[in-house]
Every structure is written in C-alpha cells, then in structure tokens.
Amino acid sequence: MLFRSIWSQIEYQIPYATTSPQLFEALSEIGVSAISNAIDLIANGSTPTAQSGEVSIAAKVKKEECRIDWNASAEEILRKIRAFAFNPGVFSFIRGEQIKISEAQLAEGILAPGEISATGLVGTKDGAIQLINLTPAGKKAMPAKDWLNGFKPQQGERFE
C-alpha cells in the first residue's frame, strides 16, 4: 500500500530569520530534487520506505492568531511575523487602523509593550522590535519609515 509511504526524503535546516515566502521558495527548489529521485526509484522498481510515527496535521490558522500580542516576547513576535509574513499576515491596530507587519527585526530599546517610537521601534514584553516593512489598511506594502513619515506617532502612543 502506498499510503504513508516515503519515496524520497531530504532534511533541511531552516535558517534563523527565514520568512514563510523564503521557506516556500527554498522547499520548492529542494522538492524538485526529491521528486526526481522518487521518479528514478519508482522507475527502477524500488519499494518505498514505510513512514514511522504518527501523521501530523497542522490546524488551520485563525485570523485572531495573527493579531500581535505586544505582551509577548520580541522573539515570539518576530517568529509570528516571519511565519505569517505572506499569508495570512500578522496585524495590529493603531488609531483604529489595521496595520499588517511583514518584516521586522530585533532592536534595542525600552518601551512599554505596543508603544511605538517616531523611528519605528515597538516595545514588547522583554525589549523591542524595529518595524521594516508594513501594509496600512487599504494601501500597498511600504517601508515602515515611509509610513512613519506620514503617520507621525505621538509620544507614548501604542498599538492596540
């Protein structure tokens, strides 16, 4: 039976700051090699290896899971941004407007969780992140610095 059979397998170490779109691209390239290898094995009459362990299925991501909790650690927030950078995207609200954040990095700074500075630093439970790219509601993706030029955060203003 071919169910739960493995024809080809390649291990891949995911680099630290990889976003989901970057991972999809890398895996699509690696997949070509795996598929080619599997076709050769099938053509040569080889039998597949049985899968060990249980099958794991990822649950569907709910929209509310993509909302940033600024009381989380900077690392947790960055992981969420990288994981959902492309789809469905992580978001937060400020001044009642939804902002999707597609790229950020760890930064030094001491701000309250969710507090945003004029330079795009945002406070977290244990530090800060620097906004790099984002998408305001109804607009195209843009560098955070361009958004900040028009938005002009007030002292102590916070993402919700």
Question: Language-model segments: which ranges?
Answer:
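Polar low-complexity intrinsically disordered regions
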Residues: 1-2, 147
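Active-site-proximal loop/hinge segments within enzyme catalytic domains
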Residues: 3-107
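An anion-binding loop in the catalytic cleft
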Residues: 71-160
